[in-house]
Design a protein with these regions (language model features):
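Exported/periplasmic cell-wall-interacting domains
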Residues: 59-64, 80-199
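C-terminal motif of bacterial Sec signal peptides marking the signal peptidase cleavage site
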Residues: 14-16
């Protein structure tokens, strides 16, 4: 029993020593309903998403998507199958197929976000996630209750790329305005770490 407690304590200690992901940056455009992921300023991929149908903001119980600078605080769902249902961040054992009628649970993976500014300070306590949804037919239009929804296959890819601590920027502007260098077709170099434009 003591050995198990020791191993558990050692595991928790090592997990807390993992360096935050400073290599990746997620940028979400609520205007375009798109998400871009960058690796040291180089665009890796873009995905269609769905943000809140109630608009933007971070008021408690508002069901709105917060704007500004956030970070990935926790990752939940390692190795879960596509469509695996989560309730209170715990797998239920149920699998839901895309576009199942009458179903709208959180599925596949969860990236739990923490706000880094006053304008999004409630995000973590409001359980704002980037997560999979079975309502894939609604991806590309505002349909969520505050979270950022993705197709299950897309959230698995994103989940495998980013780590805890990865920066997340949510803007109203188009991605081309929010990411320096994207308009010219050039990625932002590691030396050019200009902040993302927030409009």
């Amino acid at each position: 029993m003591r050995r198990n407690n020791y191993l558990l304590l050692l595991g928790l200690l090592l997990a807390s020593c993992v360096a935050p992901d400073t290599q990746h940056h997620i940028v979400v455009s609520t205007r375009e309903q798109k998400l871009a992921v960058l690796d040291r300023g180089t665009l890796m991929a873009t995905y269609p998403v769905s943000t809140s149908k109630f608009g933007l903001g971070d008021y408690l119980r508002s069901s709105r998507t917060p704007l500004g600078q956030l970070e990935v605080a926790k990752k939940i769902g390692d190795n879960a199958p596509l469509g695996a249902v989560f309730k209170d961040r715990v797998r239920t054992g149920e699998i839901v197929a895309p576009n199942s009628p009458g179903r709208d649970p959180i599925v596949t993976r969860i990236l739990w976000l923490r706000g880094r500014e006053a304008q999004n300070a409630n995000a973590f306590g409001r359980y704002i996630y980037i997560h999979g949804t079975p309502e894939e037919r609604l991806i590309g239009m505002p349909a969520s209750y505050g979270c950022i929804r993705m197709r299950s296959t897309d959230i698995v890819q994103l989940y495998n790329i980013v780590g805890v601590g990865a920066a997340v920027t949510i803007v109203e502007a188009p991605l081309i305005s929010a990411i320096p260098g994207l308009a010219s077709g050039h990625s932002m170099s590691p030396a050019n770490t200009a902040p993302f434009v927030m409009r």
